[in-house]
């Protein structure tokens, strides 16, 4: 028998029976094809013992996660793309639902428009950690409301003909994928953040491999990544939290390593190939040189000049570059063969440790070369790092077993780079789902022709990028619309609103034209009447409501 909720009976056999039964249910859940590509570093019983005695709850977000999985699976099977953009508010999601099959919630947009501290700022993830989960709840509740409102309205049809007159229903329950930044702290913070997202309606979340303390927008300079395993631990924590909560949460692993210039630690051998070192043994540590200059009163520009000079004098290189340069300077006769011997064993995807690379270099050269990655460390204690597409491939391969989709943040909408990344990931994981940020930080008119813009999404889709999104389109379309209307209103008064807004709403059949109805006034009137025996003298949509003026404008009711 199951142990009662909040059980106080000290029965060992009953406890073991409950845990065995719960573990069996979890194993049955995990046997579904949904999890065929998912790796877990723990057992079903490990999850069972951490669930408590309360019966498992099916969170609405888990229903939406299963829906999202089916949406993405269909796109994968058909070679099509789920495309969406960052939504700001309930108005936007109610309109997006007519045409798009997913919704994105951007941390950047929340940082500038929806921080729970009400303090706007750039995308540094320094807002309270409940900011994006709160926006998810805001928009998810709006989705549920519009879904309820629509069903109640359609229930009034007395025949198939009347239902046909209403048109096809809108699927307002569009799965939401939200920005989890870099986790807002250590693994316990990642766990709590994931829990908030699940509780508040997110079908999926993405998390990047930047440090949480130095997190930057994916299109800012100075990005610092964490070691590969540290981000794997984050992804494992996300899935563990979802498993404990019996959630099918979709997990997107993002890497910012393509343009990363710093890394927090040298502990993971998979990162060693990309860590920058000094090759000049006579150079002083950079942090000491900079600190001395600061103490002597150097200005900002002087400090920048000092850093540039130090970097030139230090002979900064990756270790394999230093080895190749040393081979080419040597008197060895078969230089190209020796270089090939070294690079065949020390490459961006070989995961060779620095210790092993040094040993091989000594075997080839007959002596050790000077290379020190401690000397160039910056004042914050971070190591210099040179990422790139191959670095992103290495990391995406490491993240893939723990995530449903992988995503490389990039600085340009470069199709060839996207192709290189996709092929590099799929060489090891052929069925891996990919995501792509169609960022408004890119100068699209400068990057490609109009015809290329038109086909870009599907060309990426052909490479396996099944989920693509414009992170800040909600922000930019909002700004553009209000900019234009404010300008025209200042000049033309009510003509600007009547002709450029209201008339266009009529022409395009935008349901917000009847904003009282859109907001659910009729639905709420129905609730009031239901509560009061069928009548309400204070019904909002009764005689006298100004929205009656729109009855003859030809817009669908």
Swiss-Prot record:
InterPro entries noted in UniProt: ICL/PEPM (IPR039556), Isocitrate_lyase (IPR006254), Isocitrate_lyase_ph_CS (IPR018523), Pyrv/PenolPyrv_kinase-like_dom (IPR015813), Pyrv_kinase-like_dom_sf (IPR040442)
Residues noted as binding Mg(2+) in the record, renumbered to the chain: 179
GO cellular component terms listed in the entry, alphabetical order: cytoplasm; extracellular region; vacuole
Catalytic residues (UniProt): 217 (proton acceptor)
Annotated control of activity: Phosphorylated and inactivated after addition of glucose to the cell culture (repressing conditions).
Temperature dependence, free-text field: Thermostable for 60 minutes up to 50 degrees Celsius.
Remarks, miscellaneous: Yeast isocitrate lyase is the only eukaryotic member of this family that is located in the cytoplasm, instead of being targeted to the peroxisome or the glyoxysome.
Protein name as annotated: Isocitrate lyase
Species, as recorded: Saccharomyces cerevisiae (strain ATCC 204508 / S288c)
């Amino acid at each position: 028998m199951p142990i009662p909720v909040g059980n106080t009976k000290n029965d060992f056999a009953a406890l073991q029976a409950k845990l065995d039964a719960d573990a069996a249910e979890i194993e049955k859940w995990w046997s579904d094809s949904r999890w065929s590509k998912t790796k877990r570093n723990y057992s079903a019983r490990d999850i069972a013992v951490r669930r408590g005695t309360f019966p498992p709850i099916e969170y609405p977000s888990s229903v939406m996660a299963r829906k999202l999985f089916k949406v993405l699976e269909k796109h994968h099977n058909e070679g099509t793309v789920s495309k969406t953009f960052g939504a700001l508010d309930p108005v936007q999601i109610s309109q997006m639902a007519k045409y798009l099959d997913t919704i994105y919630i951007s941390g950047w947009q929340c940082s500038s428009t929806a921080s729970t501290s009400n303090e706007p700022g750039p995308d540094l993830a320094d807002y309270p950690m409940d900011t994006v989960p709160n926006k998810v709840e805001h928009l998810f509740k709006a989705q549920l409301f519009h879904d309820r409102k629509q069903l109640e309205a359609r229930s009034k049809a007395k025949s198939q003909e009347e239902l046909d007159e209403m048109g096809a229903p809108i699927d307002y329950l569009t799965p939401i994928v939200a920005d989890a930044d870099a986790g807002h702290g250590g693994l316990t913070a990642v766990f709590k953040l994931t829990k908030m997202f699940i509780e508040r309606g997110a079908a999926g979340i993405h998390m990047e491999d930047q440090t949480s303390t130095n997190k930057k927008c994916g299109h800012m300079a100075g990005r610092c990544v964490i070691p590969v395993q540290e981000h794997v631990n984050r992804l494992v924590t996300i899935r563990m939290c979802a498993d404990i909560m019996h959630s099918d949460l979709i997990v997107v692993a993002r890497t910012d390593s393509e343009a990363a210039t710093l890394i927090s630690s040298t502990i993971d051998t998979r990162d060693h190939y990309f860590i920058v070192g000094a090759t000049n043994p006579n150079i002083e540590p950079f942090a000491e040189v900079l600190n001395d200059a600061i103490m002597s009163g150097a200005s900002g520009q002087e400090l920048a000049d000092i850093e540039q000079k130090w970097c030139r004098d230090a002979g900064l290189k990756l270790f394999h570059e230093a080895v190749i340069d040393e081979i080419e300077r040597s008197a060895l006769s078969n230089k190209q063969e020796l270089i090939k011997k070294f690079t065949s064993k020390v490459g961006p995807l070989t995961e060779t440790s620095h210790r092993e690379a040094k040993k091989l270099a000594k075997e080839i050269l007959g002596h050790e070369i000077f290379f020190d990655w401690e000397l160039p460390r910056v004042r914050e204690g971070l190591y210099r790092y040179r990422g790139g597409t191959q670095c992103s491939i290495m990391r995406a391969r490491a993240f893939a077993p723990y995530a449903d989709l992988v995503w490389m943040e990039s600085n340009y909408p470069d199709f060839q780079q996207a192709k290189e990344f996709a092929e590099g990931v799929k060489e090891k994981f052929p069925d891996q789902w990919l995501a792509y940020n169609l960022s408004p930080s890119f100068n699209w008119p400068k990057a490609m022709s109009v015809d290329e813009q038109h086909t870009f999404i599907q060309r990426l889709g052909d490479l396996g990028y099944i989920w693509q999104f414009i992170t800040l389109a909600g922000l930019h379309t909002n700004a553009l619309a209000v900019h234009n209307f404010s300008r025209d209103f200042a000049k033309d008064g009510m003509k600007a609103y009547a002709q450029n807004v209201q008339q266009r709403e009529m022409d395009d059949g935008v349901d917000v034209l009847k904003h009282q109805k859109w907001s659910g006034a009729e639905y709420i009137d129905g609730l009031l009447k239901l509560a009061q025996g069928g009548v309400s003298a204070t019904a909002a949509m009764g005689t006298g409501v100004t929205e009656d003026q729109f009855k003859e404008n030809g817009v669908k009711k």
